[in-house]
UniProtKB/Swiss-Prot annotation:
Tissue: Expressed by the venom gland.
Keyword Secreted: yes
InterPro entries (UniProt xref): Cystine-knot_cytokine (IPR029034), Nerve_growth_factor-like (IPR020408), Nerve_growth_factor-rel (IPR002072), Nerve_growth_factor_bsu (IPR020425), Nerve_growth_factor_CS (IPR019846), Venom_nerve_growth_factor (IPR020433)
Disulfide bonds: C139-C204, C182-C232, C192-C234
Name of protein: Venom nerve growth factor 1
Glycosylated residue positions: N148
Pfam families named in the record: NGF
Region (Disordered): 47-69
GO MF annotation terms: growth factor activity; lipid binding; metalloendopeptidase inhibitor activity; nerve growth factor receptor binding; toxin activity
Protein family according to the UniProt entry: Belongs to the NGF-beta family.
Length: 243
């Protein structure tokens, strides 16, 4: 009886193994797999064409960094221009960010152009701190960082073009100038503060000096001396006596 059962089981297993395989288990290279592969390839090719057309109609947006470099000056400055210390001035700064506080830790203003200087002076009148009680300045001055300075006078009195943005080693630096001006030509009704108005006429005026700045000469960058405002002084003259 047991031998008969074993024989039936073996015959049943042999029948299962001999049955034809379904299309789901067709080996690679069979017609079913080829059709599926062709369909997949066609869909992939169609997807690639669609993505290419989409990219052409809607190009990828440029990075902000690339846009910033594109808007900067096209002239690339040779780094060797900055290696000589005699060309450096404490009132000229090249930076990628607005300058911080001044060296004496006084608050200074940041200007985008020279036209806003008068507006900022009227809007924000910040006096220099008094170091000791009872000490006053003859003239009141204000110091500002000036950016976007495009025109200036050179040491020969000729107008020159000042470089605003400098492309150095694929980095865009802005050229800043630390300028000092008189806040008011007459800090007191009689003129300069502390001057005997009975014998002297006085008024405050802004004086200039020369600093080395990076300027444009044709299509090349070069160092030149230019005039900028650097101090506020008192000018006095003796009053004439009427006889």
């Amino acid at each position: 009886m047991s031998m008969l059962c074993y024989t039936l089981i073996i015959a049943f297993l042999i029948g299962i193994w001999a049955a034809p395989k379904s299309e789901d288990n067709v080996p690679l290279g069979s017609p079913a797999t080829s059709d599926l592969s062709d369909t997949s390839c066609a869909q992939t090719h169609e997807g690639l064409k669609t993505s290419r057309n989409t990219d052409q109609r809607h190009p990828a947006p440029k990075k902000a960094e690339d846009q910033e470099l594109g808007s900067a000056a096209n002239i690339i400055v040779d780094p060797k221009l900055f290696q000589k210390r005699r060309f450096q001035s404490p009132r000229v700064l090249f930076s990628t960010q607005p300058p911080p506080l001044s060296r004496d830790e006084q608050s200074v203003e940041f200007l985008d152009n020279e036209d806003t200087l008068n507006r900022n002076i009227r809007a924000k009148r910040e006096t220099h701190p008094v170091h000791n009680l009872g000490e006053y300045s003859v003239c009141d001055s204000i110091s500002v960082w000036v950016a976007n300075k495009t025109k200036a006078m050179d040491i020969k009195g000729k107008p020159v073009t000042v470089m605003v943005d400098v492309n150095l080693n694929n980095h865009v630096f802005k050229q800043y100038f630390f300028e000092t001006k008189c806040r008011n030509p007459n800090p007191v009704p009689s003129g300069c503060r502390g001057i005997d108005s009975g014998h002297w006429n006085s008024y405050c005026t802004t004086t200039q000096t020369f600093v080395r700045a990076l300027t444009m000469e044709g299509n090349q960058a070069s160092w030149r001396f230019i005039r900028i405002d650097t101090a506020c002084v008192c000018v006095i003259s003796r009053k004439t006596e009427n006889f």
